[in-house]
Amino acid sequence: MLNRIRSVFAGERGLPRSQVERLGRLPPGERLAGVGAALHDLCVTTAARFVEEEHRRADSPFGGLPKTDLFHEMLVMNFWALERLFKGRRRALMDQVYDRYSTSFVWGWESGRTDLVDSMRAKFTAYDEAWDDYSGHQDGFARQALAIIFGGTPVAEAPRAAFWLISYADRTMKDFTEVGKSVKLLLRDAA
């Protein structure tokens, strides 16, 4: 099994090979929680990398946003990408991801896990309705994401911000497709 997982990650897109090997050695009953934690951490790392890159660039359209707010919205976008990848077939795994999220990132909110997940799912629905798998034109998605990220405030650099959000979402989905292959192998015999 480990050799098949290694072959999936030859390009190291997604989870690092060493992490996949470690997860593959977990007993099947512990593997679901381990994979959920790894996916959560991957989403966090990916969102944090985007925020840091954007805040380093002097001409970033996201430069005026607080890092924590931008990070949270990019994290939600990553969770949406995972939901799209699994198409509802990995509910127990996504519950592990959201449990870790709700205990790690409360942002001072007064709400509990259910309210946090419901809030994210409303954004997922908006993103799903706007994403165009058929034509590949993602202007509607970009408008929706900009409205969520900027709270409906007009964005002076909207075309550039839209470009970066579409590029980010597309790249993340492609990278997560590779992650999905290892998840399938890792959870094949897990409880």
Over which residues does each language-model region extend?
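Residue-level signal for alpha-helical context at structural boundaries
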Residues: 53, 57, 96, 115, ...
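Non-catalytic accessory regions used for complex assembly or targeting
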Residues: 1-38, 187-191
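Short, flexible coil/linker elements and helix-boundary hinge sites characteristic
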Residues: 10-11, 87, 112, 151
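Hydrophobic/aromatic-lined pockets within catalytic cores
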Residues: 83-86, 106, 188
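Polybasic, proline/glycine-rich intrinsically disordered low-complexity segments
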Residues: 22, 26-51, 95-171
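N-terminal interaction modules that seed assembly of large macromolecular complexes
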Residues: 45-92
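Glycine-rich, aromatic-bearing surface loops/beta-hairpins
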Residues: 172-191
